[in-house]
């Protein structure tokens, strides 16, 4: 069934509840539906349609009140959008519901897609959208006593636009009291079989939480009866920043969403911008992007490998692996001039060509790593203590993973081979040969094993980049390429002015909507951008894998021990900046 056939099917089944189809820059359909029909439409797409849309990739809101270009869309003050993916069809669909701006109310779909829970809380927190059918409208990223909903267009983007912040003694006491654990508000049981449960605040300063994040646990002895993750400590308004920075200036911010992923996190953002602009990236730039992305994938997975061993009691591996990571960073430094956050991709290409001697550094790295991975297999994967701490621990199947929005290695560990680089190749990946590693049991051990095998496949991809690096330009010959190639600006005053305006104010991107998706180090990272024909984004929606993966803790942790939880959290491989944005 094609996208057009699916829309015809939905129109026939739901009649006037299907309001209209919206034209976007994406290849998949976007459909407006009545808010009260949302649960029924989502339920049909998940359970009843052939090759169902089992994955709710994202759910977000858009404040339409200041938008100028809404041609072909129904009236809406606040829009709720949900992005669904069918792995069987390898297809997507976006459903939108128009809401009132003053008192936005939608209908919850958490009973259909369990992972909608946190996304709906986020839409309430940042936009003030109330969801009928929900019992929990607590904030999720902001403090409980925060006033207002900051992603609304009437809310300032800078602290200098607000009155000075003053923390009085009374306010300090109120804020501290609001953060106290209330088991009833969290939905935590306080007893089981007549036995009182211990409520344990795990984090946010525990080394095992790998960042500023806490889990509130209800314990019966060492057994976890219930778990409630608490996030938001690292929130810094990245999506709001996307509305005030130019399209070009926002690139460095994408590195800091997942601060261990480096340039790999720039890929989905630039895909969306380039789709809006109609830019085709040259082959040499594509190959350079892929090579650097795969180096960063190895850097990340080595860190996970070492710290996971450390969480399970082995100290030595992480120090050996930092030596390997340093070799990778030598390549990154030589090419980009930076290490963790290069901000090096550009709209239409990359910042500069490869330096002299890059191939020698890459070849040395490729010759070095396979033997090291062989050594670590015996040191970690074959270690009896490590296996005892990870085999059979925190296991889940593919259906559970999809219910909770788990992608990347966490999904592939269940035996599902869905990888965007293979399923829907982007940015030149269609030109490379590599395998998609999978596990069998979906446990902590398999999640580590999949990442280890992914490193070997990344080495394979990098070697193909080394052996078959195309010649040619590193930036697209397009008016909106930013900054434009120097040869476009040195001819006359007109080209010089175009360069000056494009760099100082930023390129004016045509009005429209576009989505960029990438298989980043943790899973599906997605940018849904709305342009209103200006020098900056009207709405920058960032879908991160870590946000979805941490939400699943509440479903998977019960039945584990506290020691098991340490291994489980380590195997998720989340980054708190990726969660909180």
Swiss-Prot record:
Membrane topology: Peripheral membrane protein
InterPro entries found in the cross-reference section: NADH_DH_suCD, NADH_Q_OxRdtase_suD, NADH_quin_OxRdtase_su_C/D-like, NADH_UbQ_OxRdtase_30kDa_su, NADH_UbQ_OxRdtase_49kDa_CS, NDH1_su_D/H, NiFe-Hase_large
Keyword field contains NAD: yes
Secreted in keyword set: no
Catalytic activity from the UniProt record: a quinone + NADH + 5 H(+)(in) = a quinol + NAD(+) + 4 H(+)(out)
Main location: membrane
Enzyme Commission number(s) of this protein: 7.1.1.-
Keyword annotations of the record: Cell inner membrane, Cell membrane, Membrane, Multifunctional enzyme, NAD, Quinone, Translocase, Transport, Ubiquinone
Cellular compartment(s): Cell inner membrane
Region (NADH dehydrogenase I subunit C): 1-172
Cellular component, GO annotation: NADH dehydrogenase complex; plasma membrane
A Pfam family recorded for this sequence: Complex1_30kDa
PROSITE patterns in UniProt: COMPLEX1_49K (PS00535)
One Gene Ontology MF term: NAD binding
Enzyme class label: translocase
Stretch list, region NADH dehydrogenase I subunit D: 196-581
Function in brief: NDH-1 shuttles electrons from NADH, via FMN and iron-sulfur (Fe-S) centers, to quinones in the respiratory chain. The immediate electron acceptor for the enzyme in this species is believed to be ubiquinone. Couples the redox reaction to proton translocation (for every two electrons transferred, four hydrogen ions are translocated across the cytoplasmic membrane), and thus conserves the redox energy in a proton gradient.
The protein's assembly and partners: NDH-1 is composed of 13 different subunits. Subunits NuoB, CD, E, F, and G constitute the peripheral sector of the complex.
Family listed: In the N-terminal section; belongs to the complex I 30 kDa subunit family.
Name listed for the protein in its UniProt record: NADH-quinone oxidoreductase subunit C/D
Gene of this entry: nuoC
